[in-house]
C-alpha cells in the first residue's frame, strides 16, 4: 500500500474563467437545469482535486501534445510553455463526466490550467508570459 502524496492543488485564474464559461453555456443551453448541472460539475471538480492531491499523475497523458496540425502544435507549445512558467514539467488531462481538465504537475504540486467540454478539441489557454 502506497502512502498518499498529499500534493497541493491550486487553480489559475484561467481555470476559474473556464468554470464560468461552462456555467454560461449551461445557462444558454437550458436555464432551468443549469444550476443542478453546474452543481454537479463543481462536485466533480472537488472530487478531481481530492484525487489529484492523493495521486498527481492520475490523469492520462495530454493527448493534444502529439497533435499533427499546425493549430494543434501551436496549442501544445502554448501549454508546454505555460507548464514551464509554473515550474511543473508534466502536463496531463483528467476526464470528468462531460469535461476534461488540463493540469500541470510535479510530485508535490498540481496546477489546474483549464477545462473544456468533452466535445471540442481545443482548450481555452491563457497567453503565456513573454
Residue ranges of predicted features:
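Enriched for short, Lys/Arg-rich terminal
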Residues: 2, 82-130
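Basic, Lys/Arg-enriched alpha-helical interface segments
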Residues: 1-90, 128-130
Amino acid at each position: 500500500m502506497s502512502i498518499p502524496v498529499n500534493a497541493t492543488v491550486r487553480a489559475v485564474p484561467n481555470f476559474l474563467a473556464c468554470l464560468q464559461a461552462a456555467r454560461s453555456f449551461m445557462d444558454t443551453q437550458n436555464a432551468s437545469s443549469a444550476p443542478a448541472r453546474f452543481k454537479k460539475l463543481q462536485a466533480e471538480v472537488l472530487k478531481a482535486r481530492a484525487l489529484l492531491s492523493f495521486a498527481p499523475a492520475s490523469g492520462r497523458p495530454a493527448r493534444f501534445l502529439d497533435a499533427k496540425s499546425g493549430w494543434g502544435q501551436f496549442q501544445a507549445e502554448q501549454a508546454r510553455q505555460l507548464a514551464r512558467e509554473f515550474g511543473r514539467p508534466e502536463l496531463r488531462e483528467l476526464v470528468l463526466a462531460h469535461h476534461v481538465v488540463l493540469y500541470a504537475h510535479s510530485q508535490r504540486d498540481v496546477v489546474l490550467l483549464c477545462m473544456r467540454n468533452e466535445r471540442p478539441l481545443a482548450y481555452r489557454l491563457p497567453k503565456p508570459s513573454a
